[in-house]
Each structure stands twice: as structure tokens, then as C-alpha cells.
Amino acid sequence: MLQVKIVPVTAFAQNCSLVWDSETKEAVLIDAGGDASVLKKEVEALGLKVKALWLTHGHLDHAGAVGELAKEWSVPVIGPHKEDQFWLDMIQEVSARYGFPIPQPVKVDQWLEGGEVLKLGEDEFEVRFAPGHTPGHVIFYNKNHGLLWTGDVLFKGSIGRTDFPRGNHEQLIESIKRECFSLPDDTQFISGHGPMSTIGYEKQFNPFVAGKAG
């Protein structure tokens, strides 16, 4: 059985997801953005064995703890798409600029493409390429449980910023329409910040994209 616990990290309250198989206790962390000690305590308290660190994109609040945890646990870093390499290359510089602790460098072991499938136990997670917030942003969809991890593409009542280097508003809107709004309305999603929502709710009420499903 798939289990999920959201652990907010960093001063930006980024929603890191601890996802695990309740039978095997094998786990992944999606967007381990910071506060490595907090994440380690959560993993230890639940008796989990982390198998990989997945990334939706390369921003510091999503990737800040990845270098440290990958090294400590000897696990691979999977994602995002290679177009976000420049963000990961700059993670120490950007962290210093924002007054964040300087993280360890992030080395990606497997870049992702849309259409690939990641596995955790018996569960499959479809990788969907959703650029716009960043050029290499990916999202993860678990059809079996109707769960989607949108990173900073789509939020409850909002969408991702596109005023960062290589952000693109039109591309973001297209990504939301193509990769999020094509999913069933009852799909629940976990975004990078804020509360969960459903695809159907955002189609109807999100002021930035409502009515743009087709």
C-alpha cells in the first residue's frame, strides 16, 4: 500500500513528499529541498529505507538537501529533465543570494524524459514533462491512487512563477493544459507549496487557467 507524508521544508515551506510502500518500507523522497536533519528524523521514525531521491525541478527549495542525503544514504538522484542542469549547477550561488545554508552539490544520476515510468514497489509513477516554471520541470503521476505531484507547475488557486531565468508563461499554461488537465477530474495533486487540490477544482476555479482545459 502506498503511503505519503508531506514534510514542509525551508523558509519557503516547500512540500517535500516522503512516499513509501507500507509492506516493504522502501521509500523515495520527492523534492528534498532542505532541512536534511528533519527529513532524516522522519525516515528513521517511520523505519523506512530510502531508495532514491526524485526531483521535479532544480530550484534550491526543492533540491537543497539532495546532495547531502544522496551522499549519506548512497542513493541515486533521479530527475528532473536535463534542461534544468543549469539550475542545479547554480544551487550554491543561488542559495547564498537568498541567505539559505550553502548546500552540497547535486549530481543527477538519471535525467528524466516525459513518458518514462518510475517504480516504487508495485506502484508506477508516470513522468510527465511540464516546462514553463523551469525549462526542465517534470511532474509525477500515480494512476493507481489518482495522485499527482506537480512541483511548482500548478497550485491550489495559482500557477508557478515564470519570471526566473528561462521561465516561460505561455509554455507553463500549455504544460498545465496538456499534462495536468488531461488527467481525471478527481486526481488529487500535491504541489510544491500550499494545500492539496484536485484537477477538477482547478479546471473550474483556478483564475489563471480555469476554462483552458481544451
Predicted features along the sequence, with ranges:
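Metallo-beta-lactamase
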Residues: E93-V94, V117, E124-A213
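Short Gly/Pro-enriched turn/cap motifs at secondary-structure boundaries
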Residues: V7-V9, K107-D109, F129-P131
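A generic local structural motif
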Residues: Q14-S17, L39-E42, A63-A65, E113-G114, ...
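Active-site neighborhood of phospho(di)ester-bond hydrolases with catalytic His/Asp-centered motifs
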Residues: L29-I30, K51-G58, V77-H81, F129-G132, ...
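Residue-level recognition of specific faces of alpha-helices
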Residues: Q3, N15-L18, D35, A52, ...
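Conserved beta-strand hairpin/beta-sheet module of binuclear metal-dependent hydrolase folds
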Residues: M1-L46, I139-G151
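Active-site HxH/HxHxD metal-binding segment of metal-dependent hydrolases
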Residues: D35-K119, D123, Q204-G211
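Short, glycine/acidic-enriched loop or turn micro-motifs at the edges of active sites
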Residues: T24, G34, L60, D84, ...
